[in-house]
């Protein structure tokens, strides 16, 4: 899947070790005992996909306090971009990250697709295009 071989998957660290490393990183930025100090989960189609896997990781590692780290509402660029593409959606082949980025005028390097860092960069670029189209003042 996504160019990852079985051998690569088998060489990964144990799930619990990855969980401990993630919590260590989160602990640097979030006081899990302060209900107003949390992170937003941000991604592309993360609301219906990635967030569930991350929550399951916490559960499988015996951590019932996923909500101590993250706000319950996430920022899903997949959902956020939808109203901006309503006029062309019927003409789009699909709503995958690459297709949406290209439709938003973002140059794509197909050799880098499904690389985690590159996908984050594309998601960020789509988000910036969305923000550029909004007239919101906070």
Task: Give short role names for the model-derived ranges.
Residues 40-47, 52-53, 57, 89-138:
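Acidic, Mg2+-coordinating catalytic module of metal-dependent nucleases/exonucleases
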Residues 1-51, 102, 114:
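Conserved non-catalytic scaffold segment of RNase H-like nuclease domains
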Residues 16, 71, 91-95:
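Alpha-helix N-cap/helix-start motif at coil-to-helix transitions, marked by capping-box chemistry
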Residues 74-91:
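Short alpha-helix plus adjacent loop in nuclease-associated cores
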Residues 5-12, 61-68, 107-111:
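Short, polar/flexible loop-turn hinges at active-site or ligand-entry regions and domain interfaces
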Residues 49-73:
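Substrate-recognition/cap helix-loop segment adjacent to the acidic, metal-dependent catalytic center
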């Amino acid at each position: 899947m996504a160019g990852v071989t079985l051998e690569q998957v088998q060489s990964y660290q144990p799930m619990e070790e990855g969980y401990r490393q993630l919590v260590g990183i989160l602990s640097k930025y979030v006081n899990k005992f302060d209900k107003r100090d949390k992170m937003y989960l941000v991604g592309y189609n993360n609301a219906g996909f990635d967030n569930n896997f991350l929550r399951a990781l916490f559960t499988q590692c015996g951590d019932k306090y996923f909500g101590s780290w993250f706000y319950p509402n996430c920022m899903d660029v997949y959902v956020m971009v939808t109203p901006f593409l309503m006029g062309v959606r019927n003409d789009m082949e699909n709503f995958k990250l690459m297709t949406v980025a290209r439709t938003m005028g973002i140059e794509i390097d197909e050799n880098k697709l499904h690389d985690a860092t590159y996908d984050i960069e594309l998601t960020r670029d789509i988000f910036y295009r969305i923000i550029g189209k909004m007239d919101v003042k906070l």
